[in-house]
Amino acid sequence: MFTGTGTALVTPFGGDGSLDEVTLRALIKRQIEAGIDFLVPCGTTGESPTLTHKEHLRVVRITVELTNGKVPVLAGAGGYNTAEVIEVARELAALGADGILSVTPYYNKPTQEGLFQHYRAIAEAVSLPIILYSVQGRTGVNIEPATVKRLAQIENIIGIKEASGNVSQMAAILNAVPENFIVLSGDDAITLPVISLGGRGVISVVSNEIPAEMSELTRLALHGDFSGARAIHRRYHPLMEINFVESNPIPVKAAMAEMGLLKPVWRLPLVPPKAENQARIRAVLESLELVEQIPAGRGAESAHAAIAS
C-alpha cells in the first residue's frame, strides 16, 4: 500500500495565514492526476507543528475525501506525548486514513526502550498500519536498527521512513527486518541507493513540484530499470538539493509559489527564504523549464511573502 512515491504534502495558507482549502484541494487533485502512489498530509513538510488540532484533522479529512480510495492516505500522527498521539491516531482512523506516519518523540529524548514502548502502545491502541518515522536531525533521537527489528514484530507496525541520511544504517535495518517490512527513504536524493538495497520507495518532498517524474523514478527503480531511474534522478537532482537550501518546507513552498501552485506564505517561526536563496530556487526552476525564464529581479517578488503568525 505504501510503496513507490508518497508525497509529503505541503499545507497551503492564505494571505491572512488561514488554511487555504481551495489550494489544498487543487494540490491534492494535481497529485492524483500525476499518478502519485500515496499521500502524506500533516508531516514535517506540511508544517504540522504550526497547525491547530482542528486544522490537522481538517487537512486529513480533505485529503481522504478527495482521494476517495484511489490513493492511500498516510496521515501524520506523532509527538512526545504518547497518550496524545494515541488520541490523534484514533481520530485519524475515524476520518478514514489508511495508515499513520508517526515521528519519534522529540525534545524529551527517550531511550531505545522508551521508543519501543511508545510505539507498542500506539500499535495496541489502533488497528491502522503504522509507519515509523526516524529523523534524528530534527528530533534528537534515532531509532536504532535493533529497535526497528523489535518493532517490526508487531503486526500493524509495517514500515519505517528512514530520514537519517545514513545509508549504512538503512542497510542494517533492511538486513534485520522481515522482507515484507517497508523501508522508505526520507530523503529524495538517496532514493535510488535505498531501493537498490531493498527499500520500497520514498516519502518525497520534491514530488510536491514534480509528482509524475518522481513517481516514474521509483516505478522504474522498483522494476529494476536503474538506468531509466538514474536519468530522472540526474535531471532533477538540483531541485532535490535546492529544496533543502533552508529548512524544509521553506524552499519547496517558495518553489511552488514560483510555479503558481500556492501563495508564498509560511507560519512563524518559518519565514520566507533569503533573497539570494530565492534567486537560486528560481534559477533551478528555470533550468528545468518548470517556470518561464523572466528578466532578472522580477521573479524574486515572492521572496517578500507575507508571514502568517
Regions found by a protein language model. Name each.
Residues 60-68, 90-93, 123-124, 152, ...:
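Surface-exposed amphipathic alpha-helices with a cationic face
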Residues 1-7, 11-140, 148:
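Active-site beta->alpha loop and helix N-cap motifs at the rims of alpha/beta catalytic domains
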